[in-house]
Amino acid sequence: ISICRFFSVPKTKNSDKPVENPPDLSGAGSFFIPFGSNLPEIDDINFHRGYGIWGAIDRLGIPKFLQKDKNKSIGFLIAHGEVLPREKNSVSLSKKTDEWGIPIPYIEFEWSENELNMAKHMENTIRKSIKAANGEMKNIDELMNIPLGSLFTKNLIALSDSPPPPGYYIHEVGGAPMGINEENSVVDKFNRLWRCK
């Protein structure tokens, strides 16, 4: 399950300093904050497993003329949480086939109370992180001058207040549960497929 939020923070004295060979967005120009729910000092957790928050500041390559406040840096935080395996969530093959005759996957999946509780915690952690950095959480059209921008951004699923549907951020939805036998799992405790010898 994932939550995406944009924000602005005051620029630092080095914010506009040119960077030689700037890193790609998904590389060294971003950061990752892990959050484990099994830490002993955490007492307000009502979900299992954990999540991490991926983010960056001033790495989106937004031209200055599009920025509403030139004295602020624009950043994003995207929290990705672990989804519990449940028998109800499944992938099966449809009787329908694609243009090459291959059966189309049929995915049955929904968030459980665990993931929805985690999403609320992720949202709260993102808010606290932005506040700790003296920043403000804002919608993307509050940060940038995009002609007719709100017409495009108001319906973007990733920018909505609630978590996007399962599979929107593809890496949060697993499909091969680990278990003790082939009847209830795809892989064994060593992550080996039951059906491969």
Labelled PLM ranges:
Residues 1-117, 160-177, 184-186, 193-194:
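FAD cofactor-binding and catalytic pocket of flavoenzymes
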Residues 118-122:
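Hydrophobic (often cysteine-bearing) scaffold residues that line and stabilize catalytic clefts
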Residues 123-131:
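Non-transmembrane alpha-helical segments in soluble domains
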Residues 130-190:
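An extended, acidic, His-containing surface patch that forms the Zn2+-binding/catalytic region
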